[in-house]
Amino acid sequence: TFRRVGVAALLLASVGLGACTQHVVRVSPDQAIDLSGRWNDVDSRMVADALIQQSFEAAGGDNWVSRHTRGSGGDRPTVIVGTVRNRSMEHVPVSTFVRDLERAYVNSGAVRVVSSRGERDEIRDERDDQQEYASADTRARLRMETGADYMLQGEIQAMEDREGGRSVGYCQVDRTLTSRESSERVWVGQHRIKKFIDRPRFGL
């Protein structure tokens, strides 16, 4: 009897261990996979692309890019992506979102993008070192940085409505583009995400 009980226990243990075996599958980075309903890499990329596309949409047949280009003799506007404030309770990798915004602007070909303040400090340190240690024909010139014409800023807000095992997650991303010289807001945009999450309940 004890032997049968022992064998049965071993069988149950082996089945349990088999059920807990980790299984990893490589998927495309572009594939949308929502496990928790929280902000993820697809949301970051999708929202960035949508907002940058919004910023180029013309109001009354004209937009800030074309107005700037006309007023500057054909030069493309230069943009710096500034602060993104996370006002939500979710963990949002803001730096990833900033990179997605920069990527979308650069890939558009309509504007130029300059480095952030922290990145510029590192570049300036390297440039200063070059003045002392690099050869004259390879060192970067001083005071030749491109100044930004506009700064992109904004915030992320989120809320959740939960009842039992079901919930609705709502996320709103607001962005503003402001002239560095006049402080005029040349564009205000918003993109929203809404997700329904149904968490099954398991009963014993």
Residue ranges of predicted features:
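Sec-dependent bacterial lipoprotein signal peptides
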Residues: 1-20
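C-terminal/domain-edge helix-coil "capping" segments
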Residues: 20-74, 141-149, 160-170, 174-204
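Acidic/proline- and glycine-rich, intrinsically disordered low-complexity segments
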Residues: 136-139
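N-terminal segment of the mature soluble domain
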Residues: 50-63, 75-134, 182-188
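Residue-level detector of alpha-helix boundaries and kinks
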Residues: 5, 36-40, 86
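A residue-level signal for beta-strand positions that form part of recognition/binding surfaces
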Residues: 14, 76-78, 149
